[in-house]
Structure formats: C-alpha cells, structure tokens
Amino acid sequence: MNISNIKIMLLGSGELGKEFIIAAQRLGIHTIAVDRYKNAPAMQVAHESYVIDMLNSDALEQLILAKNPTYIVPEIEAINTDSLVKLEAHNFNIIPCAKATKLTMDRQGIRALAVQQLNLQTSKFAFANSEQEYLDVIQSIGLPFVIKPVMSSSGKGQSIVKEHNEIKKAWDYAQNGSRGHAKGVIVEQFIDFDYEITLLTVRHKDGTSFCDPIGHIQKDGDYRFSWQPHTMPDTALAKSQEIAKEITDALGGYGVFGVELFIKGDEVFFNEVSPRPHDTGMVTLISQNINEFELHLRAIVGLPIPDIQTLQPSASAAILLEGDTANASICGIDKALADANVDIRIFSKKEIHGKRRMGVVLAKAQNTHIALETSKQALAHIHLTK
C-alpha cells in the first residue's frame, strides 16, 4: 500500500483533531485543517489550514472541490451535512460516511435510528422545538430529567433538572449551548445507573474491533475524568459490544466510533454515538498500544488493526481552566510532570472567556483507582498565570 499520495481534510480542528493530524503526519500523509476560527489546535500541526463557516454550503463545497482531498474527516457536528451527502454522491470519501455524519449531527436523528429501527433500550425521552413543547413533555417524562440541545458538543447546554425551579434555567442554558441553527432539545428521563462507559468501536476492512471499556465522570454534561479499563460483568460487557456493533453497523463506514452507554446491573442502555474519536478516549494516549486517533487513521486508510491492548491501567483528567484573556498562559506543568507516571497534553488555545478545556493530564498506575488519584494530584498543580 502506498499512502504517500493520500490527502486528508479535517472539518473541525479542535484538540481531538490535533491528535488525529499528528497521527497522520507521522505516516507522511498530507493534512488540511479547517475550522471557523484562526489558529485552532489542529491547524497548528497541519500542512494547510483554512477558516470558513462550515455550515455555509457554498463555502464548504468550494473549498473541498478546490483541494480535492482523498478523505474528508468531520471532527465536529456543526457542518453542513447536506453538502457532505451531495459530495459523497460525486465520489468524495466522507468518513465514516455521509449517512453517519448526518444522522449523528443531532440527537433526533440518532435516536430515531437506535429506537425505531434497531429497537435499542434507552431512557424514556421526548423532543421539544419550543419552550411550550418543552414544558408539555416534562409532564410525561417527570422529574428528575436530563435536557440537552439536539445539536451540541462537549456537554454544552446539558443539565440535570431535579427541582421545578430549575426548569426555566435549564431551557435557557440549552438554547445558549446549542450549535448550528437547531434550537430543539431532547428531554430524557434520568436513569439512576450504576456507571456509564464509552466503548470505542473500530470498524475496519477486516471487521469490528473493541477497545477495553472506558469509565468516565461528567459534570455539567462535560467529561472531567476517564479511566481504562473499567471493570464490568461479562454479561454487561457482551451486551455493550453487541449494542455497539449493531449501531455502528447501521451507520456504516470505517473509523472509530465512541459509543456511550449507561449500565445498571446487567442492563445496558444506549445513550449516544459519535462517528469519530471521543474526548473520554484521550486516556488511550497513555493506556493503549494503539491510541484512538491512530486507530481512526488506520481504519480510514485501510491499514491493519492488530490486537488492541490496554498496556497498563490509566486515567485522564481534563484541564478545565477559568479566566478572561486572549493570551492564556498555563503554569504548574513542571510540578505536574515531576511524577514519572504522568504525561500532559496542552491544546495551545490562547483565548479563554469563562471556562475552557485547555489540556489533559494522563496518568498510569497499577490500578485505575491509583491512576485516577494520580491524575487529580497532577491536575491540582495546573492553573492560569496571574
């Protein structure tokens, strides 16, 4: 196989895209990073970069036609997916495929596939496209419930509502956190689950492979900590893999899919799926023989996917910092790296207004509990320069 002539265009250039671009660069693949703002993380390591509104069909199609990439790899949901469907019909290779990108760009599309077509078990849910509809569906869902924008990323706009006086605030928060032009929400019955996992599922030319389950903690709908492997009963793991294969087969295409699942005893509830590497999967940068970004690349270009191994129990901690500056400077990295079992990725985002994920701490240990505590101790050293 000759991969030297491959050209990959990444649509969305955040921190996950940056690691994907690095994986491609290491194999000599030409990379193009695209986003709506200058100097996004992946742009800093790509051969070429372009700033466009990816929701604008004309701008998106003109750039793709001009650059003629071998593979078009979406990294975010805020993309004009109708354009991707159109381009795929003209023999452009959308990853994993235009259908998967379109269905997963909003929660309404993927729930329709999961529940109506595949009959997967989920929490009780309903969609609302106005505040009045939202108030109406609450009557059937009941408290407590989870509200999420139909289109958002990194937990933006998500909240758990436990009291009546939180209902209005949660609606407003969801509207502010919505991406693209969609303003609808999904209201889900809150499941008192035992734990939640991400099952990284790799569809490739030789079949489907699974990474070990990744446990994670979220706050305000956003990932804060993850660890691998997450120990779970064989029955629940088998059900999780069955669900993950079913949903990813229905979506189609090659690449890594982040399948989010709730586990309660031996019951497994489908939550969401992303047709790309997952933020909780950043732990694989230290835990696995082949990390999720390398797996995504290999699956896309047709390279072998050998046995995926968890080398050592590991954990990750998101570096979520708060401030108001256009020139962020991070301190404490030296203290965090004093531990030989700790590594760090800084995403090189300069602007921060409020809270923003600026990096990730990675830690390994003899078990996941110690790895998680080690990541938290290292995280405590890191802060913005005052």
Curated annotation (Swiss-Prot):
One of its GO terms (biological process) is 'de novo' IMP biosynthetic process. GO terms for cellular component: cytosol. Signal peptide: none annotated. It catalyses: N(1)-(5-phospho-beta-D-ribosyl)glycinamide + formate + ATP = N(2)-formyl-N(1)-(5-phospho-beta-D-ribosyl)glycinamide + ADP + phosphate + H(+). Pfam families: ATP-grasp, PurT_C, RS_preATP-grasp-like. N(1)-(5-phospho-beta-D-ribosyl)glycinamide binds at residues 15-16, 75, 279, 349, 356-357. Residues 112-301 form the ATP-grasp domain. One of its GO terms (molecular function) is phosphoribosylglycinamide formyltransferase 2 activity. Pathway: Purine metabolism; IMP biosynthesis via de novo pathway; N(2)-formyl-N(1)-(5-phospho-D-ribosyl)glycinamide from N(1)-(5-phospho-D-ribosyl)glycinamide (formate route): step 1/1. Its EC number is 6.3.1.21. Keywords: ATP-binding, Ligase, Magnesium, Metal-binding, Nucleotide-binding, Purine biosynthesis. PROSITE patterns: ATP_GRASP. InterPro entries: ATP-grasp (IPR011761), ATP-grasp_carboxylate-amine (IPR003135), ATP_grasp_subdomain_1 (IPR013815), PreATP-grasp_dom_sf (IPR016185), PurT (IPR005862), PurT/PurK_preATP-grasp (IPR054350), PurT_C (IPR048740), Rudment_hybrid_motif (IPR011054). Mg(2+) binds at residues 260, 272. ATP binds at residues 107, 148, 153-158, 188-191, 196. Involved in the de novo purine biosynthesis. Catalyzes the transfer of formate to 5-phospho-ribosyl-glycinamide (GAR), producing 5-phospho-ribosyl-N-formylglycinamide (FGAR). Formate is provided by PurU via hydrolysis of 10-formyl-tetrahydrofolate. Belongs to the PurK/PurT family. Homodimer. NCBIfam families: PRK09288.1 (NF006766), purT (TIGR01142). This is Formate-dependent phosphoribosylglycinamide formyltransferase. It comes from Francisella tularensis subsp. holarctica (strain LVS).
